[in-house]
């Protein structure tokens, strides 16, 4: 009886837990590869959405269309504020930092970015539209990318300009 009670409590705790990296990606790949039946898929999606919601994130998980990951990405800061379109494709060995958006072009939500292998996306980057980020590229902090990026490229912002104004006291 105690063992059953313990298993039930662990099950409930697992459902309401905030984010478990191993469990999240295990469920993600089972859904992505159609390895589970519909009722289990729905339960997995609910659990994944709860984990995402707690972290202010959305990794493109839907019942009929999900973003595609070749392999589990590296998330040094967890899910914190990461948004990925349902139609995005993410390559192998990709590193995604916090507050990154990989989204559609604002017109056609099926036109989402394709991220190559071994790409690093630093905090605050926004990658939008029907574009391709080539393999081994680096997207710098707070960069807004809306054009294709060739392989082996580094994308950075221009140096900030300082505009000095006289005070109007």
Model-predicted regions and their roles:
Residues 106-108, 167:
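Short acidic, glycine/proline-rich loop/turn micro-motifs
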Residues 59, 65, 70-71, 76-77, ...:
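Left-handed beta-helix
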Residues 1-61, 167-169:
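Terminal amphipathic alpha-helical/low-complexity segments used for targeting or macromolecular assembly
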Residues 80:
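Aromatic- and Gly/Pro-rich donor/ligand-binding loops
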Residues 155-169:
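Short, basic/aromatic-enriched C-terminal tail that caps enzymatic domains
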């Amino acid at each position: 009886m105690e063992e059953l009670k313990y298993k039930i409590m662990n099950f409930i705790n697992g459902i309401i837990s905030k984010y478990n990296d191993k469990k999240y990606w295990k469920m993600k790949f089972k859904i992505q590869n159609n390895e589970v039946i519909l009722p289990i898929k729905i339960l997995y999606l609910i659990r994944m959405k709860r984990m995402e919601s707690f972290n202010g994130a959305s990794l493109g998980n839907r019942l009929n269309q999900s973003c595609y990951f070749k392999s589990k990405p590296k998330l040094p800061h967890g899910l914190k504020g990461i948004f990925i379109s349902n139609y995005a494709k993410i390559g192998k060995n990709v590193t995604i930092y916090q507050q990154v958006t990989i989204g559609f072009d604002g017109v056609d939500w099926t036109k989402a970015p394709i991220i190559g292998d071994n790409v690093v996306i630093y905090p605050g980057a926004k990658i939008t539209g029907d574009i391709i980020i080539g393999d081994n590229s680096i997207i710098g902090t707070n960069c807004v990318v809306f054009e294709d990026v060739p392989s082996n490229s580094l994308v950075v912002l221009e140096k900030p300009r300082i505009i000095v104004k006289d005070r109007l006291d």
